[in-house]
Amino acid sequence: MSWRSEHIWIDLITGSRKISNLCWAFTLFLGSLGFVLVGTYSYLGRNLISFFPLQQIIFFPQGIVMSFYGIAGLFISSYLWCTISWNVGSGYDLFNRKEGIVCIFRWGFPGINRRIFLRFLLKDIRSVRIEVEEGIYAGRVLYMDIRGHRAIPLTRTDENLTPGELEKKAAELAYFLRVPIEVF
C-alpha cells in the first residue's frame, strides 16, 4: 500500500503478519503437537489416540524420534508465532522531496535494534536499481543505491511482483526522486 502527493511518497511495508505465515505457524503447531502426543503416549503405553494402534508405535526408536521432531517443531512454531506477534519486517519508506530526505523504518526483533530507522538526503541517492535473478529461485528486487552506503532493498524477496509491476514501480520512484534506473 502506498500514498503519494506532489512532494511526499509513503510506501507501507507488510511484515511477517501475512496469511501464509499464519497458516504455516498454525499447521506446524498442530503437527508438532500431534508428534509430541504420539511420542508421549507410546512412552506411557496408553492408547489415547484412537486412530493409531499403540502396538505399531513402540517407544524405542519411533516414540523417541517422534517426540524429538515434535519438540523441534514446537520450537520452530513458537519462533513463527513470535515473529508474527512482533510483526518483524513491517514499516514504511518515506520519500520527501520538499525537505530533501528519505526515511526508511522497519520493525526488528526485540532488543537494542528493535527499531531500524535510516535517514538519507535525496541528493545522496545515485539510482534506483532492479536486480533480476534467473533460475529455479528467480527473484526480482528493487534497490535504492546510496553514495557511501550499500544498496538498500525496497521490496521484499518474497514479494512476487511481475516484471511489468516492478518496472512500473521503479520508473515511478525514479521519476519521483529524479534519479536514473539501473538494471542488473
Curated annotation (Swiss-Prot):
GO biological process terms held by the UniProt record: photosynthesis
Give the transmembrane ranges. 19-39, 57-77
Nucleotide-binding as UniProt keyword: no
Which Pfam families does its entry note? Ycf4
Decide whether keyword Membrane is in the record: yes
The record ties this protein, via InterPro entries, to: PSI_Ycf4_assembly
Where would you find this protein in the cell? Plastid thylakoid membrane
Keyword field: Membrane, Photosynthesis, Plastid, Thylakoid, Transmembrane, Transmembrane helix
Regarding the membrane, this protein is recorded as: Multi-pass membrane protein
Name the domain of life this protein comes from. Eukaryota
Example GO CC term: the record gives:
photosystem I
HAMAP family according to UniProt: Ycf4
Q: What does this protein do?
A: Seems to be required for the assembly of the photosystem I complex.
By its UniProt entry, which PANTHER family does this protein fall under?
PHOTOSYSTEM I ASSEMBLY PROTEIN YCF4 (PTHR33288:SF4), PTHR33288
Family in the record = Belongs to the Ycf4 family.
The name this protein goes by in its record? Photosystem I assembly protein Ycf4
Its source organism is Cuscuta reflexa
